């Protein structure tokens, strides 16, 4: 049957779907309005069941008579169970993923709207606060975030009755806050848990503030690198702590794949080496990590102490990875299916790194092209940036994000160990590091990264 006012044929307009952001949404409603809507639906279903009213047109009918000819007893009231699924809200706060033609979206005020999808996740699926093991030097973390407005009304008859479950699913196009659901907005690929919180505003995330990172973000917003980093929207207070209000880089992606690439030939500051020599602090946890990778790595003295210093561990870690050879290393990957991996500690050669990127992109030539263009854009911007020229960039990462709709983006993140140089000093970022020259090898790593992706594009 054709409903009045509804066109025949396909119900969805041509091109509509998760990758077509042009559909209009229903008006936004508050959580209170949603609750009232739900309660009204509960009351209506219960009243209909109590009155013995027939099911809605189109529902599967059961026999109205039992074998002995007596009328079938009215079923017990059916109470819907509310399930709010958690998807990504897609209103970027600043430069977001590129559009389908590869153009980068404009800054604040732009909107990338996508149709919502039903999901099988529920309020009881709270998830974990940490996806992967903590890293000793990175601060990328997960967070709770604003939920998408996907609602399922699941109605079930009394469990004592021998009947099938009936599910009534409705999709409500309005964003709601779900305090019971955690969305991995900033994926915990490598870092300390608890660094991030939900901002309560679409497209934003809160990161625990540190003086060095706050200093850097303020200056980056006035530098040519502004479009290459998460947009910074000031400091807010939550639970007695200060948080940086940042752009949620995963906003606007549908089932994103994420890769964290630690840049530079070292991830420790020169002053850390100095302090370690003056007041060496032994770390048993880092000794255990070293032992797990290579039992022969610790010296006899370290075996006896069953501990190593942090700089010693980090120098060893960089030596077994591609940091010292290529100027970057892969910290972790999250795929669209939610599976994560940080097993890249010994990924050292160019060939090994190339295979990892190839698997990460799964042969998507368009994503590869966009990644390559974005990296070249970032390199061009870094080379003219006054901020970059006058800062030692340590422990910072490039965050790669793409989805099945061929959206792809790369951003510089994590500036907690980025420090200004003395007046008059500038860095080349490609020269070999020697203690005292403060070179970080950032551009050396970026050159190699671009070369690896370019070689994949030529295949």
From Swiss-Prot:
Pfam families listed in its UniProt record: IPK
Region (Disordered) residue spans: 1-29, 49-164
Biological process (GO), any one: phosphatidylinositol phosphate biosynthetic process
Residue positions, PTM Omega-N-methylarginine: 35, 55, 62
InterPro entries in alphabetical order: IPK, IPK_sf
UniProt catalytic activity: 1D-myo-inositol 1,4,5-trisphosphate + ATP = 1D-myo-inositol 1,3,4,5-tetrakisphosphate + ADP + H(+)
Keyword Translocase: no
Any one GO MF annotation of this record: small GTPase binding
Record: residues binding substrate: 262, 283, 310-317, 417
Phosphoserine PTM positions: 135, 195
Keywords (A to Z) from UniProt: ATP-binding, Calmodulin-binding, Cytoplasm, Cytoskeleton, Kinase, Methylation, Nucleotide-binding, Phosphoprotein, Transferase
Protein's cellular compartments: Cytoplasm, Cytoskeleton
Binding site for ATP: 195, 207, 247-249, 260, 334, 414
EC number: 2.7.1.127
Activity modulation: Activated by calcium/calmodulin.
Annotated stretches, region: Calmodulin-binding: 285-293
Protein family membership: Belongs to the inositol phosphokinase (IPK) family.
Protein name, entry field: Inositol-trisphosphate 3-kinase A
């Amino acid at each position: 049957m054709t409903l009045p006012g509804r066109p025949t044929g396909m119900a969805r307009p041509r091109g509509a779907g998760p990758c077509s952001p042009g559909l209009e949404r229903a008006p936004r409603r508050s959580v209170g309005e949603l609750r009232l809507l739900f309660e009204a639906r509960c009351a209506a279903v219960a009243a209909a069941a109590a009155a013995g009213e027939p099911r809605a047109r189109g529902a599967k009918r059961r026999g109205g008579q039992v074998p002995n000819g007596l009328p079938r007893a009215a079923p017990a009231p059916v109470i819907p169970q509310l399930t709010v699924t958690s998807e990504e809200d897609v209103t970027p706060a600043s430069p977001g993923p590129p559009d389908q033609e590869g153009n980068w979206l404009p800054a604040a005020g732009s909107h990338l709207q996508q149709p919502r999808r039903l999901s099988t996740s529920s309020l009881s699926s709270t998830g974990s606060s940490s996806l992967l093991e903590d890293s000793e030097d990175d601060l990328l973390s997960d967070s709770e975030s604003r939920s998408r407005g996907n609602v399922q009304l699941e109605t079930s008859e009394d469990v004592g009755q021998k009947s099938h479950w009936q599910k009534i699913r409705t999709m409500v196009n309005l964003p709601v806050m779900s305090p019971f659901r955690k969305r991995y907005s900033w994926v915990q690929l490598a870092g300390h848990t608890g660094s991030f919180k939900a901002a309560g505003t679409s497209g934003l995330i809160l990161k625990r503030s540190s003086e060095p990172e706050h200093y850097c973000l303020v200056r980056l917003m006035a530098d040519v690198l502004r479009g290459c980093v998460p947009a910074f929207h000031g400091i807010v207070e939550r639970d007695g702590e200060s948080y940086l209000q940042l752009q949620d880089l995963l906003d606007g992606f549908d089932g994103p794949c994420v890769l964290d690439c630690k840049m530079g030939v070292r991830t420790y500051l020169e002053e850390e080496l100095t302090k370690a020599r003056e007041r060496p602090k032994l770390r048993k946890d880092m000794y255990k990590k070293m032992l797990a990778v290579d039992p022969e790595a610790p010296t006899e003295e370290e075996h006896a102490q069953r501990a190593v210093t942090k700089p010693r561990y980090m120098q060893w870690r960089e030596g077994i990875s591609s940091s010292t050879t290529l100027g970057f290393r892969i910290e972790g990957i999250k795929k669209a299916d939610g599976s994560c991996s940080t097993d890249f500690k010994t990924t050292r050669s160019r060939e090994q790194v190339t295979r990892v990127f190839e698997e990460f992109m799964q042969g998507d030539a368009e994503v590869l092209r966009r990644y390559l263009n974005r990296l070249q854009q970032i390199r061009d911007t870094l080379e003219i940036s006054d901020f970059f020229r006058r800062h030692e960039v340590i422990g910072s990462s490039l965050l790669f994000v793409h989805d099945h709709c061929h959206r792809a983006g790369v951003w510089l993140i994590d500036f907690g160990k980025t420090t200004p140089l003395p007046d008059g000093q500038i860095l080349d970022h490609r020269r070999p590091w020697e203690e005292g020259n403060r070179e970080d090898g950032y551009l050396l790593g970026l050159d190699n990264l671009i070369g690896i992706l370019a070689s994949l594009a030529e295949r």
